[in-house]
Design a protein with these regions (language model features):
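Secretory/endomembrane lumenal or extracellular ectodomains immediately following the signal peptide
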Residues: 1-45, 69, 79, 151-238, ...
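Alpha-helical scaffold segments that form or flank carboxylate-/histidine-based iron centers
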Residues: 8-14, 41-55, 121, 126-131, ...
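Short alpha-helical scaffolding segments that buttress acidic/His motifs in well-ordered protein cores
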Residues: 16, 30, 46-51, 81, ...
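Short acidic alpha-helix initiation/capping motifs at coil-to-helix transition points
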Residues: 20-26, 56-60, 95, 104-112, ...
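Conserved alpha-helical segments that form or flank metal/cofactor-binding pockets of metalloenzymes
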Residues: 45-78, 246-271
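Acidic/histidine-rich alpha-helical segments that form the ligand environment
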Residues: 83, 88-133, 286-327
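Histidine/lysine/aspartate-rich catalytic loop segments that bind and position anionic ligands
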Residues: 84, 262-271, 276-284
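Preference for long, well-ordered alpha-helical segments
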Residues: 114, 124-164, 318-359
């Protein structure tokens, strides 16, 4: 997760050695998620530990536990989590951990009534920060478990621990930034909205309007997405089939609509799009291999086997399999970010989806 031990590079970074830009971008996103934003790193790490426990990721849990041990507050939260007794935690911490559990188990993160407890304890910027953290660690747990990465010996060595200091409504659960607010935010916002190929103004996706509440995370996420495009081993339709399958599996309305728009732009026929919502009969054999893997990674990450990944590698090769995995993990993050925050879909996206399916419901 970090580089607190000099010269130590985590296995999740070395696993991406053939794609150094992606490795650097994921490490940068991990740093931004934990150390940037309005929330203290400790509460985000405690939420990350809950994600790791739910997803049975020993690798992620070991890294997070090591980082929690670097401060008194972190050690206190770790003791509570290890004992299973959260009653002595302050209310805001209990609410954050309950939200992390809910968002990991269901991208919609409970009812609006349940979410009010989150809103009573945290402001919009803090909610975006926490949601991004939970989304990222759902990304990371799936990535490291799919590759069966071993925990590094230095992570487990106490002597290596560094020292340190302390029902859906139509509106989103957080307020989206307006064009005027984005315009005065400074360089991070401009980097996101003015990058090559980016949309801006009224066309800026609502996911970015929300994420820009924590500019460092928004910039790190944008950097990762740009780096991922450089792998380019998958054809665009297969990549979108993966993200569509993950979003459908999670029941994420916002992301599903966006994938349909992307597939239509590639020229996928309405007939195939209609068939895709019923079953996989319209997919090619190659697409089915990718989609089957992505669905299992999404619904049962701890049940993924070496044979599952070998099947993917057999069809796509080492680099292509890694790209399928990264695409599925990307939407483990984004489904939780957009659906957990109940972000409304943009009017044009809704209309494009309605043109295909005759409804704006999944």
């Amino acid at each position: 997760m970090d580089y607190s031990v000099k010269g130590r590079v985590p296995n999740y970074v070395t696993a991406l050695a053939t794609f150094p830009d992606v490795a650097q971008a994921i490490a940068g996103l991990a740093h931004a998620v934990v150390h940037e934003g309005p929330l203290a790193p400790e509460i985000k790490l405690a939420a990350a530990l809950r994600v790791a426990q739910i997803n049975n990721s020993a690798y992620t849990a070991a890294h997070v536990q090591r980082m929690l041990r670097t401060s008194e507050r972190g050690r206190s939260l770790l003791r509570n989590l290890e004992s299973g007794d959260l009653s002595s935690l302050r209310e805001a911490d209990r609410v954050a951990l309950t939200y992390a559990d809910a968002l990991t188990n269901d991208t919609q993160a409970g009812s609006d009534a349940e979410f009010r407890a989150v809103q009573q304890n945290y402001g919009d910027d803090e909610i975006v920060d926490l949601t991004a953290a939970v989304g990222f660690f759902n990304y990371l747990t799936r990535f490291v478990e799919a590759l069966a990465l071993p925990v590094e010996s230095w992570v487990l060595d106490p002597a290596e621990t560094p020292s340190g200091g302390e029902g859906q409504s139509d509106a989103g659960r957080v307020a989206l930034l307006s064009d005027e607010e984005i315009a005065v935010m400074g360089s991070a916002a401009r980097t996101v909205t003015e990058r090559p190929g980016a949309t801006s103004g009224l066309a800026l996706p609502n996911s970015q309007r929300a994420m820009l509440r924590v500019p460092a995370i928004s910039l790190a996420w944008t950097t990762l997405n740009t780096a991922l495009k450089g792998i380019n081993k998958l054809d665009p339709e297969t990549a979108l089939q993966v993200s569509f399958a993950v979003s459908m599996e999670n029941g994420c309305r916002y992301c599903t609509m966006h994938q349909v728009v992307g597939l239509r732009r590639l020229g996928v026929s309405p007939a195939k799009l209609l068939a895709m919502k019923k079953d996989d009969a319209s997919l090619t054999a190659r697409e089915r291999v990718a989609v089957d893997f992505a669905r299992k990674l999404t619904s049962s990450p701890s049940e993924l086997t070496n044979a599952d990944y070998e099947s993917l590698r057999g069809e796509f090769g080492d680099d292509g399999a890694l790209e399928v995995l990264l695409e599925a993990c990307r939407f483990a993050f984004m489904n939780r970010f957009t659906d957990g925050l109940r972000l409304p879909s943009e009017d044009g996206t809704v209309q494009a989806y309605r043109d295909v399916y005759g409804t704006d419901k999944l």
